[in-house]
């Protein structure tokens, strides 16, 4: 995620900066929009925690006309994870064609970095299903039209699922406690289900330390943040206590120690039990 005006998913950089300090471009760290993020944290690490049938079970077909499942991927970077999620959730089942599966899911993928978005558009193997746009999700004015325009194409007012994968830290560092809370309030208002991969606090410290080593300014809000410590629990608290969400499932932790948390809007009707992850990792800390 690009943290400056907002997000760009490279939000992955914090862990990379600790493990591969020479691999990141110096100017990228403050925004999180690392150009080769998937080389260090491949999509497969997240996918192994997410049941392939998750979307099918959460959103079963209604009637003979199957309306598409609508997703929003916030901080999509160069689209590697967006494409991987699409293929993972819609891999054809026995007797099902690829073309039939591809009509079931449409994802709007946004990032603040136009260079990464251009790369995502150029390399996307599913242009009919994945739409990439340059967007500052923290800009309350500029985000309205593209989000509502996408939804209106399908006669919808909210997304079925919003994906926030390793973006919360960059929002928090660049916009402070208030910005993080505003971001969570906004994305939770946009969907029935919200999948969040929060960065742990150690990644905040690593991001600030890396900037100091490079001789760059530190994040303005870092030392004044009151929301700190166990960030997964903090985000659960904010979403459940303040924004009408409930924690539906924790799918476990990635190998770089980030939990995948699925939230459900309380007004959402639970039609199916959430399938269990294929792994046995269940920690939320």
From Swiss-Prot:
Superkingdom in the source lineage: Eukaryota
GO biological process, one term: negative regulation of pre-miRNA processing
Main location group: cytoplasm
Top EC class of this enzyme: transferase
EC number: 2.1.1.-
Pfam families, per database record: Bin3 (PF06859)
Domain Bin3-type SAM: 53-275
Reactions this protein catalyses: a 5'-end 5'-phospho-ribonucleoside-RNA + S-adenosyl-L-methionine = a 5'-end (5'-methylphospho)-ribonucleoside-RNA + S-adenosyl-L-homocysteine; a 5'-end 5'-phospho-ribonucleoside-RNA + 2 S-adenosyl-L-methionine = a 5'-end (5'-bismethylphospho)-ribonucleoside-RNA + 2 S-adenosyl-L-homocysteine
Keyword entries, A-Z: Cytoplasm, Methyltransferase, S-adenosyl-L-methionine, Transferase
One MF term in the entry's GO annotations: small RNA 2'-O-methyltransferase activity
Cellular localization per UniProt: Cytoplasm
Residues holding S-adenosyl-L-methionine: 46, 77, 111, 136-137, 165
UniProt similarity note: Belongs to the methyltransferase superfamily.
Summary of subunit composition and partner proteins: Interacts with DICER1; the interaction may be mediated by RNA.
Functional summary from the UniProt entry: O-methyltransferase that specifically monomethylates 5'-monophosphate of cytoplasmic histidyl tRNA (tRNA(His)), acting as a capping enzyme by protecting tRNA(His) from cleavage by DICER1. Also able, with less efficiently, to methylate the 5' monophosphate of a subset of pre-miRNAs, acting as a negative regulator of miRNA processing. The 5' monophosphate of pre-miRNAs is recognized by DICER1 and is required for pre-miRNAs processing: methylation at this position reduces the processing of pre-miRNAs by DICER1.
Entry protein name: RNA 5'-monophosphate methyltransferase
